[in-house]
């Protein structure tokens, strides 16, 4: 089977990752001790994608947990699912990266990276046919951002032909933990543009907004935010974990979603999201799901898709839905909003379906969009970066770890290039002649 090795780095990555494993274990009927307690063969059919069967009916996640300080690891280990993970797969340092990207990437993280790679190698050797890696991390800190990107590039070196998917929590304008987030994020994006195949962008502000507006939570906790992230991660990976018609592995998803290799940053969304109190008053129908899924308020990254155009979209429907109805609704959305979809990629909306609904829903849909509006997010970080870098504020923390100012300048211009590329494809229209030629190219020759 096509296995995926999961890595989680830093505090954020480990907390999201732990939540992800809770949701996935629940969907596959695996108890906290790794015993299978499920009730349908569908749960086991492709379980080897994420789990290793170590004994009769005992499953262990293919997960590597990494941090530069022991704190978060201890809380994962003492949590409900702590005994699920293989004890050797906890790799941690003692010093912490102190929100310093350079520490994660060049000094502290670089010391730990070889022992992490040993564990990764071991996991990869236990796979039949490894399809790739997924990593959960944040881009604003030191370990997740600095060491996370170091790991990505090292794994890239060693497994050049395997897919690399990242679930990256992007710093948001209103919810900021540290003042150097723009530095860490820009340096990380500089790495991700080159080394990742698909990056799912999530940001705390958008998650807070969803909790306030849609779920009507007065004081959302990080637990609530992580729960949202884990629902989306579970949705994105549905097609990898369960048998389905459009049987996407990571590579097929990338082929459908990435028109140009650098533009692989996706917005994600999930529907139905309803406040707990009003759940029983709403019938969940396919049109309802489709409209909520494309709603700007539903995006888990703080960019408004109405500011750009979709290059490609993938929608994963789960549960008992009529595919005919789904196709009709998806088409009508495209026809009504045709100027929000680029016309030079025909059939740029892909729909997949999996019969198994997530817990607590009869049907649901997960949205993945490659929209040029994601440039808002990069612009915002770039502006904050420039404001500080112009004054060389806080730079000594990075140069003290052996970094060069040149690297900052490079990262800054790479990010600006990325924004410019998105803008270029947003404005690209097909000329009439081009359109005719494209149409002629597409028409199969008569035989």
Curated annotation (Swiss-Prot):
Residues 430-447 have a biased composition (Acidic residues). The keyword GTP-binding applies. It comes from the Eukaryota. Belongs to the tubulin family. PROSITE patterns: TUBULIN, TUBULIN_B_AUTOREG. Mg(2+) binds at residue 69. Tubulin is the major constituent of microtubules, a cylinder consisting of laterally associated linear protofilaments composed of alpha- and beta-tubulin heterodimers. Microtubules grow by the addition of GTP-tubulin dimers to the microtubule end, where a stabilizing cap forms. Below the cap, tubulin dimers are in GDP-bound state, owing to GTPase activity of alpha-tubulin. GO terms for molecular function: GTP binding; GTPase activity; metal ion binding; structural constituent of cytoskeleton. It holds the Pfam family Tubulin_C. SMART domains: Tubulin (SM00864), Tubulin_C (SM00865). GO terms for cellular component: cytoplasm; microtubule. Coiled coil: none annotated. The keyword Transmembrane does not apply. One of its GO terms (biological process) is microtubule-based process. Signal peptide: none annotated. GTP binds at residues 11, 69, 138, 142-144, 204, 226. Its cofactor is Mg(2+). It is found in: Cytoplasm, Cytoskeleton. This is Tubulin beta chain. PANTHER family: TUBULIN. Gene3D superfamilies: Helix hairpin bin, Tubulin/FtsZ, C-terminal domain, Tubulin/FtsZ, GTPase domain. Residues 427-447 are annotated as: Disordered. It comes from Uromyces fabae. Dimer of alpha and beta chains. A typical microtubule is a hollow water-filled tube with an outer diameter of 25 nm and an inner diameter of 15 nM. Alpha-beta heterodimers associate head-to-tail to form protofilaments running lengthwise along the microtubule wall with the beta-tubulin subunit facing the microtubule plus end conferring a structural polarity. Microtubules usually have 13 protofilaments but different protofilament numbers can be found in some organisms and specialized cells. Keywords: Cytoplasm, Cytoskeleton, GTP-binding, Magnesium, Metal-binding, Microtubule, Nucleotide-binding.
């Amino acid at each position: 089977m096509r296995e995926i090795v999961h890595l989680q780095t830093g505090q954020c990555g480990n907390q999201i990752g732990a939540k992800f494993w809770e949701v996935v274990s629940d969907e596959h009927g695996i108890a906290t001790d790794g015993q299978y307690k499920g009730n349908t063969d569908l749960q086991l059919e492709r379980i080897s994608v994420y789990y290793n069967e170590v004994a009769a009916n005992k499953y262990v996640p293919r997960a590597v947990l990494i941090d530069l300080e022991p704190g978060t690891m201890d809380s994962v280990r003492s949590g409900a699912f702590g005994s699920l993970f293989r004890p050797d797969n906890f790799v941690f340092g003692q010093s912490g990266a102190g929100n310093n990207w350079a520490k994660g990437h060049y000094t502290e993280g670089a010391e730990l990276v070889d022992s992490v790679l040993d564990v990764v190698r071991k996991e990869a050797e236990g796979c039949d046919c490894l399809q790739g890696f997924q990593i959960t991390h944040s881009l604003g800190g030191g370990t997740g951002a600095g060491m996370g990107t170091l790991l990505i590039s090292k794994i890239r070196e060693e497994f050049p032909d395997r897919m690399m998917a990242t679930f990256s929590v992007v710093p948001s304008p209103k919810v900021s933990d540290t003042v150097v987030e723009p530095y860490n994020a820009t340096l990380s994006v500089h790495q991700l543009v080159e080394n990742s195949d698909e990056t799912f962008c999530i940001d705390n502000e958008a998650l807070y907004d969803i909790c306030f507006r849609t779920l009507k939570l007065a004081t959302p906790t990080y637990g609530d935010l992580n729960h949202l992230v884990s629902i989306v991660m579970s949705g994105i990976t549905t097609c990898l974990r369960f048998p389905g018609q459009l049987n996407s592995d990571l590579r097929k998803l990338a082929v459908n979603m990435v028109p140009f290799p650098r533009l692989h940053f996706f917005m994600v969304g999930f529907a139905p999201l309803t406040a707990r109190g009003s759940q029983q008053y709403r019938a969940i129908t396919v049109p309802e799901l489709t409209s909520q899924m494309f709603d700007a308020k539903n995006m888990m990254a703080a960019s408004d898709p109405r500011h750009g155009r979709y290059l490609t979209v993938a929608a994963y429907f789960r549960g008992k839905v009529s595919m005919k109805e789904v196709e009709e609704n998806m088409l009508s959305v495209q026809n009504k909003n045709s100027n929000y979809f680029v016309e030079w990629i025909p059939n740029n909306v892909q729909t997949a379906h999996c019969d198994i609904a997530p817990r607590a829903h009869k049907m649901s849909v997960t949205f993945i969009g490659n929209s040029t509006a994601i440039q808002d997010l990069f612009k915002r970080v770039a502006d904050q970066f420039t404001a500080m870098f112009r004054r060389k504020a806080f730079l000594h923390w990075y140069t003290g770890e052996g970094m060069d100012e040149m690297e900052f300048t490079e990262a800054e211009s790479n990010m600006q290039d990325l924004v410019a590329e998105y803008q270029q494809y947003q404005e690209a229209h097909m000329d009439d002649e081009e359109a005719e030629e494209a149409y002629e190219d597409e028409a199969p020759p008569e035989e």
